[in-house]
């Protein structure tokens, strides 16, 4: 991994989580969210559910596999195979980052914002077996971060839009009162890191990505039309 990039990203992540804990978590835990904000969060948060994201990855995988068998030209087969590997990559990042995040949140055992007045924002009960003590990091935000970071790496031209989607869907967990802001930031960052590391592994296996001279994973260009300005 490129030394300067990962160190800078890690520094930013740690400070963002720490500042959020110090500045934003207590006000969020102590205050009641406006009804309109909570309703908006409830409306949007389902779009980041891991079940949907896993279904998308599986659909892409099998669509690519079917295309590989049905299409005739070598170029079409290569593109279909590329789609199937995108599905496999998304599945890997979403499923395994989510599993790790769930293990972490159980091991850390941070109380959720609903219990702020009872326990405060720095109450930790590891391996309690109760969802009330599984706040940090946000598993929902982890899968969202992994999913959209994967797309940002695959299609970097649109990375700003993907990052914005991840932030919005992640912060819906704050809107509905399920997590503190620091839980969401940590989850998004963890998911993004997992996608990056997985992309590096794929690149070393010659799949989907190639490594730049500085070690950063770059998506292979098998869809030149997507790279044209204005293309979707």
UniProtKB/Swiss-Prot annotation:
Q: What class of enzyme is it?
A: hydrolase
Q: Which residues cross the membrane?
A: 10-30, 42-62, 80-100, 136-156, 160-180, 183-203
Q: Which organism is it from?
A: Rhizobium etli (strain ATCC 51251 / DSM 11541 / JCM 21823 / NBRC 15573 / CFN 42)
Q: Which locations, inside or outside the cell, does it occupy?
A: Cell inner membrane
Q: Which InterPro entries match?
A: P_Acid_Pase_2/haloperoxi_sf (IPR036938), P_Acid_Pase_2/haloperoxidase (IPR000326)
Q: Which Pfam families match?
A: PAP2
Pathway annotation from the record: Bacterial outer membrane biogenesis; LPS lipid A biosynthesis
What family is reported?
A: Belongs to the lipid A LpxE 1-phosphatase family.
Q: Which GO terms describe its cellular component?
A: plasma membrane
Q: Per its record, how is this protein called by name?
A: Lipid A 1-phosphatase
Q: Which CDD domains match?
A: PAP2_lipid_A_1_phosphatase
Q: What does this protein do?
A: Probably removes the 1-phosphate moiety from lipid A species. Does not seem to act on other membrane components, nor does it dephosphorylate the 4'-phosphate group of lipid A and/or lipid A precursors.
Further remarks about this protein from its record: In this strain lipid A lacks phosphate groups, instead contains a galacturonic acid moiety at position-4' in place of the monophosphate group found in E.coli.
Inactivation phenotype: Lipid A contains a monophosphate group at position 1. Retains 4'-dephosphorylase activity on Kdo(2)-lipid IV(A). Increased sensitivity to the cationic antimicrobial peptide (CAMP) polymyxin B (PMB) but not other several other antibiotics. A double lpxE-lpxF mutant contains lipid A bi-phosphorylated at positions 1- and 4'- and has greater sensitivity to PMB that either single mutant. No visible effect on free-living bacteria, or on nitrogen fixation upon nodulation of P.vulgaris.
Enzyme nomenclature, EC number: 3.1.-.-
- Keyword Membrane belongs to the record: yes
Q: Which UniProt keywords apply?
A: Antibiotic resistance, Cell inner membrane, Cell membrane, Hydrolase, Lipid A biosynthesis, Lipid biosynthesis, Lipid metabolism, Lipopolysaccharide biosynthesis, Membrane, Transmembrane, Transmembrane helix
